[in-house]
Every structure is written in structure tokens, then in C-alpha cells.
């Protein structure tokens, strides 16, 4: 979602067909996991109750086909930007969330969508910064630090940065950032 905020009685416009397809999958018994990120913090049960999604607010570690995966959106993991950390605390604060939800959906959704658009457009040509290299890419730095205490993980899989990255961090450990769903529609297959 570019911006998702659940109001008690309002479903955000523009996502009906997508939500319907997700519901179709879960109705057929297919698990759909959704990792909360910086554009969709404000989900309060609709995606679980109405669409059958399994919503994750934090990273998870799981075993699939004999391999150990660390799965996360990537939001808030290792980002050194103090302004971003402050904004993230405000966005995750339950009181601030209740106050925002008191705003009429017409204005609240417009504000959120415009904020997301502005955030994207302030980057060059509206696209994510290119890969910064192992020494400067904060998700790589986070992963390298995390591996020191959790060296049993085979794959780290993230979104958030909207860049394609497939990086071997050791003979055993591989890190992937899924890429850009807005321009390139990239994804990973295991």
C-alpha cells in the first residue's frame, strides 16, 4: 500500500480488487503473510478479520524447506536517521494514532497519500536511492550485526528500501531486498 489507515467503518478507496484477490487466496486455504511497514502501520484488524491475512508487526524467523529465513519489512531496522526515528515513534504511538483517526477519512486519507507521494517525490525522479554499498547500506549493516548472534539463518529477506539486492554475506548466509513494486514489480522466488 502507498498508504493504509483503517478507520472503524471505512475501507480505503482503491484497494478493493486487491483485497478481494488476497481474500480469494486465504479463502482457498493459502496463507498470506503481511509485514507492516512505514506506509501501513495503521492496520488494526481489518486485514486479519476480513481478508484472512496473517499480519506481522515485527520480523519473524521461520524454517522453510530446511532453510532458516529471517523475514521482515525492513522499516526501523538499523536506520541511523534520527529524524526518521522520531517520526516513526510518533506514527507508532497509540495516542497519536487515535488522534489521527479522529480526522475525517476524506482528509486523513488525502493527508496520508500526499505525505507518501511527497516522500517518494523528494527522492531523485521519485525513485529510491541506488544501492549504497555494504559499508553504507543500513539493512546490510543491521544484517551483519544480527548474524553475529544468530548465525543459523540462511536467508534474510526485506522490502522497505525498494532496491533489488542479492548479496552473499558468508558461504551460508544470503541477504535479499525484494526491489521496487511501484516501477519494476520485482519479487523473489525460493
What are these regions (language model features)?
Residues 1-64:
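Core catalytic region of metal-dependent phosphoesterases/phosphodiesterases
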Residues 50-57, 70, 75, 79-95, ...:
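Conserved beta-sheet core of the metallophosphoesterase superfamily
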Residues 74-138:
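Active-site-proximal loop/helix segment associated with metal-binding centers of metalloenzymes
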